[in-house]
Amino acid sequence: MTTTDFDDHERSRWAGRAAAYHGSFAALCAYPAGALLDAAGVEAGVRLVDAGTGPGTVAALACSRGAVVVAVDAEPSMLDLARRHVPAAVSQAALPDLPFTDGCFDAAVANFVINHVGDPAAALTELQRVVRTGGRIAVTIWPYPAPPAQQLWGQIFEAADIERPRTMPKLAADKDFPRTAEGLSCLLRHVGLTDVRCDILTWTHRADPEDWWSGPANGIGTPGLLMERQSPSTIGRIRHQYDRLTVPYRGADGLLALPTAALLASAAVS
């Protein structure tokens, strides 16, 4: 399997955390699922690979459309969760090394996956390899600048006077790309995909405040990495800022209403 230091870091961060993700941020990442499948042309009979399936949200929706689905993920705890939700083949594999023959799928999707790999172009090239000529690939990523829902955690840590770690692995400069509609579109064109389209999806994510807190509190994402390095007293300080800074987002029902956005890009294999 081809990996970079960034890949190794990402996989270590997700190890054993499927339940924590499912109870916190999975609902946020689920929102684009229908649009993602539409962009890839997924309907009854379409042979689809869902790369980085996580808990299987996109794969399960594709199955409900009558697609013939294969779902893969690098993380065993995610696979265990996906197998409970997806009535299709679920196996362990990771971009950019998929165990499939050339052109064996009609479509491929990767929901918030390209932003978690050490070589995004290689990952897209691999998706292109396993999709037949004329098939479509669709991917989502979080944009930069970050939308309010994602900015909120940075504001919380800043208010609590928490410094970001200086040793976190980053993408190599020659592998990175601008997290904008144009940047993502250019990346797809760079690997040889055609008929490239990119839309910005915007929505308001509604979440229970305790669920939204529980993700980082259980090690999910960069906020989770920061949180697990803190003392109990510092965690208390972070929680105080969390409670204070989420007040403007709380509705009458007690839920958070968090404005957010994602980039959805799709392209054809030619």
Where are these regions (language model features)?
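Class I SAM-dependent methyltransferase SAM/SAH-binding core
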Residues: R47-L98
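A short SAM/SAH-binding and catalytic strip from SAM-dependent methyltransferases
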Residues: A107-P120, P143
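Conserved catalytic/acceptor-binding region of the Class I
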Residues: A121, R132, R136-D208, A252
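Short, conserved SAM-binding segment of the class I
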Residues: A122-E126
